[in-house]
Regions:
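Active-site segments of SGNH/GDSL-like serine hydrolases
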Residues: 48-52, 74-109
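Hydrophobic/aromatic beta-strand patches that form the interior of the parallel beta-sheet core
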Residues: 5-7, 83, 126-128
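Loop/turn elements at helix/coil->beta-strand transitions in domains of secreted/extracellular proteins
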Residues: 40-45, 77-82, 123-126
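N-terminal cationic-hydrophobic initiation segments that often serve targeting/anchoring roles
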Residues: 36, 70-75, 120
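Generic structural signal for well-ordered alpha-helices
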Residues: 66-70, 113
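Conserved SGNH/GDSL esterase-like catalytic core that processes O-acyl groups on lipids
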Residues: 2-65
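Catalytic His-Asp segment of secreted/periplasmic serine-dependent ester chemistry enzymes
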Residues: 90-187
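Second-shell loop/turn segments in exported
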Residues: 19-21, 52-61, 70, 99-106, ...
Length: 187
């Protein structure tokens, strides 16, 4: 659909939202943060970041930087419902077979997934539990759902999209929640 924009780039991390120009907009190239300021105002923003950061081994820096990014998104897109997606666990066997880096593992995914609920609460954004929706009964990505242990097959991308479309919040309720949270923070 022409009313969708994707701000994405291979290997992009939350640590680069304010300094890596990857978004083409009006003939220029901008960082994601700049594009969100200069570009259109969106009704919904979905944020899916974290797998490329697994090798940083600094959960505090991840938390802080992600929080700064969420604050910036909300400031530049005040009318948007912001959805934060957690990380889908990987398939260890397929990761090994495809020579994924050693740090791309479910212990690291779990460490970051423990941070997302804190971020959602701190910054009053909607947390989407894509991890639960896209894993098997053991909490891992099924082998037939992934091409390399991390990235999905076409069918699994479609399952992800269906989950996102089925798990939305009413924009007016979201806005009311933002206002209530601001009031609570001022007391």
């Amino acid at each position: 659909s022409s009313d969708l924009d994707f701000y994405c780039y291979k290997g992009l991390t939350v640590f680069e939202m304010d300094d890596r120009a990857v978004v083409e907009l009006d003939g220029g190239k901008y960082t994601v943060e700049q594009a969100l300021e200069k570009g259109p105002q969106y009704a919904k923003i979905y944020i899916s970041l974290g797998i490329n950061e697994l090798g940083y081994f600094n959960d505090e820096a991840f938390h802080q930087t992600f929080g700064d990014f969420l604050k910036q998104v909300k400031a530049s897109q005040p009318g948007a419902v912001v959805y934060l997606e957690n990380l889908v666990p990987v398939n260890a066997e397929k990761c090994a077979a495809n020579k994924q880096p050693y740090y791309v593992n479910n212990d690291r995914v779990a460490a970051y997934n423990a941070i997302f609920p804190q971020l959602a609460e701190e910054y009053q954004v909607v947390l989407l539990d894509v991890a639960d929706a896209l894993t098997d009964e053991n909490g891992i990505l099924p082998a037939d759902a992934t091409v390399d242990g991390v990235h999905f097959t076409k069918a699994w991308y479609q399952k992800w999209l269906a989950y996102l479309m089925e798990h939305t919040v009413d924009a007016d309720c979201y806005a009311a929640g933002q206002t209530a949270a601001e009031g609570a923070n001022e007391t």
